UniProtKB/Swiss-Prot annotation:
Gene3D superfamilies listed in its UniProt record: GroEL-like equatorial domain, TCP-1-like chaperonin intermediate domain
Protein name in the entry: Chaperonin GroEL
Organism of provenance: Mycolicibacterium fortuitum
GO cellular component: cytoplasm
InterPro entries to which the protein is assigned, alphabetical: Chaperone_TCP-1, Cpn60/GroEL, Cpn60/GroEL/TCP-1, GROEL-like_equatorial_sf, TCP-1-like_intermed_sf
Family per record: Belongs to the chaperonin (HSP60) family.
Encoding gene per record: groEL
GO molecular function, one term: ATP binding
Lineage: Bacteria, Bacillati, Actinomycetota, Actinomycetes, Mycobacteriales
Length: 151
């Protein structure tokens, strides 16, 4: 069995019979996937927010609200939220800040420390690849230049 709290992993497993429910579930899956593609984190939050928007939107439409008016209101709210988030965002610059942020995201400070070390070695333009291993523990392997895997 797989144990996860990742929104994308959970969303991928949802299969519904009802065609209308299936469309809604696919919409939420797309929200989680886009969030993962763009941010790499926050998929559970995005999924919960999408579900709340759909629930409240349907409730308002059932109560007689204009669907286009709701859409315009949501778009204005998204603009304001985005603006506010960008104003409150802080640059993560130091190795310690990277380690703290990565540790929170990974749910494990030792992973955060390893990511910070990797970022320190490759710089902002470098590529970091995370792979599963048959061995126990964490390790950092640095490849300078280019690496081509067979295939």
């Amino acid at each position: 069995p797989t144990i996860t709290n990742d929104g994308v992993s959970i969303a991928k497993e949802i299969e519904l019979e009802d065609p209308y429910e299936k469309i809604g579930a696919e919409l939420v899956k797309e929200v989680a996937k886009k969030t993962d593609d763009v941010a790499g984190d926050g998929t559970t939050t995005a999924t919960v927010l999408a579900q709340a928007l759909v629930r409240e939107g349907l409730r308002n439409v059932a109560a007689g609200a204009n669907p286009l008016g709701l859409k315009r209101g949501i778009e204005k709210a998204v603009e304001k939220v985005t603006e506010t988030l960008l104003k409150s965002a802080k640059e993560v610059e130091t190795k310690e800040q990277i380690a703290a942020t990565a540790g929170i995201s990974a749910g494990d400070q030792s992973i955060g420390d390893l990511i910070a070390e990797a970022m320190d070695k490759v710089g902002n333009e470098g590529v970091i690849t995370v792979e599963e291993s048959n061995t126990f523990g964490l390790q950092l392997e640095l490849t300078e230049g280019m690496r081509f895997d067979k295939g």
